[in-house]
Amino acid sequence: VFSISRRQLSVIAAALALTACHSPVNEQPPAPELGSGYRTDLTAQHAERHMAAAANPLAAEAGREMLRQGGSAIDAAIAMQAVLTLVEPQSSGIGGGAFIMLWDGKSVHAYDGRETAPAGATERLFLKADGKPMAFPDAQVGGRSVGTPGVLRALEMAHKKTGQLQWAKLFEPAIRLSENGFAISARLHSLIAADRYIAQSPEMAAYFLNADGTPKATGTLLKNPALAEVFKRIAKEGPDALYHGSIAEEIASKVQRHRNAGSLSVADLKGYTAKERTPLCTDYQQWKVCGMPPPSSGGVAIAQILGTLQALQAQDPSLAIAAMQPVKSPSPAGLEPTPEAVHLLAEAGRLAFADRALYMADSDFIPVPVAGLVAPDYLAKRAALISERSMGIAKPGTPEGIQVAYAPDRSPLRISTSQVVAVDDQGGAVSMTTTVEAAFGSHVMVQGFLLNNQMTDFSFIPEEDGQRVANRVEPGKRPRSAMAPTLVFDRKSGELLATVGSPGGSQIIEYVSKSLVAMLDWKLDPQAAISLPNFGSRNGATELETGMFSPALKQALKDKGHMLSEIDMTSGIQAIVRTRDAQGKVSLSGGADPRREGEAVGD
């Protein structure tokens, strides 16, 4: 039974008042990762046996190589992650962390490989001497921002559950590419050219820049023998190769001796453990949607957005999102959502992000009211706040299960990360969102790979007006994330329908929500759903992908009271849909984001 004291109510009321009188953070966040232009030639890829999709074609092919050898979906994901460490170093790698959603054909598993704060971290980590928060670049670049990497431990845990191939085999494509070299892509070249901190790191400069300091050109063959040796050790010794011994010692030394030093130690690395969490599964129409629980906020926020849309339909059938089909558009996508659909998804997003800012953090440290936040009764009350006009800035609600009140977290919203999905011959599936946080992470390079700057995903400010922020820095804590690897099932049959996810910082929630509605409600194939223009709200302006929306749609939204912000929304959505026809034949269709370099491949 839900109960709350008078004192707790007064504290919560104060927090709500704080939120009402503050707008979201005004600090300009880092620019999004550059896209690759918008590819207009993509169509859904089809397969009968298995499929893999990743943000880089070399990674996708590594995944398919494992599937062709009888590997499971997690085998494919491990091979793809290893290759991404090499070919997409700005986005993810073995020096970072990941969340993994896994379907083994019988049950759903959620693996948390999120980085943790070192034992020496304090809540004043990102405060200057005067008590004010650091500027983001001052916090990001260097050892200060490095959390204990977790991706290899999470992959190890998942592999023990459903791996079919030997661990060592999964690193063969990455070792081969590291030794023989790969061609620098246009996107990687652009990101190198745009990053002014690479030149400050001797290791990064030697690897990414020419002798005269210019970025290596697109098409340059880039070899990484140091990383090949690391992969060989990991293949032979398992993740212990990274968390013990000489590699761990060098990681700790590089972090602690950097001019912007951090506290990550060998003991932190030795002590890291991945965690198997209880998946967050909620019903949406005739589907069951499963995502990550805290410390990711992505699963909760997406469940809230979908639940709010469902509640709106129950309250007024004319607001059924399924009836708001996209319309033809002269944009590169060829389609755009209707103003009504953008309005409803943006308003639902505002409500979800208001709750996210107040309640979401590492549930091992903070009592996050997850059940209350996704409860149908609560979402019905939240849906009732949506009208024909935009609410502007939403206030957080008061779900059941609140134990402690916190101040809202108004940290800048980051843009980063990578995504892989796979479905294997047995119908097993994986969705993994993986990251080093900002582009090129902390810019600390160790033996050919980059370390994360995941500590900057904590709130820089530990308290506000006497109230503590839930997502403040604490030793051993995992920072809040928006990563949202998602699996979708048919509620009646229990069969897997889709695996989907995206990079993009806090905008991941917008990207995945859009894709789910497009695939489930609007019946678009995965490629069309991914290619659909991005939009939404993170409880600020209504965000529209630059150059993708008609003047008529923008005016219609303005007429509803929306403040619009046209911005680059460089998602990297990957999705695979699995269907069975009347004769029982299974088929797969996959899509990759036209805004990046990825592809879906299968047999």
Name every feature range the model reports, one short phrase each.
Residues M66-L67, R153-K161, E237-H244, E249, ...:
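Alpha-helical support elements that line or immediately flank enzyme active sites
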Residues R6-S10:
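N-terminal export leaders
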Residues P24-E61, E65, A73-G238, L242-H244, ...:
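Noncatalytic scaffold domains of N-terminal-nucleophile
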Residues T19-A20:
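C-terminal motif of bacterial Sec signal peptides marking the signal peptidase cleavage site
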Residues L86-G93, F99-W103, S107-A110, G262-S265, ...:
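Active-site rim segments in enzyme catalytic domains, especially the processed small/beta chain
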Residues Q426, G476-R478, V512, D521-M569:
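Extended C-terminal subregions enriched in glycine
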Residues P30, Q315-T435:
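Internal maturation/activation junctions in enzymes
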Residues E276, R414-T417, S481-M483:
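Short, small/polar residue-rich loop motifs at catalytic or cofactor-binding pockets
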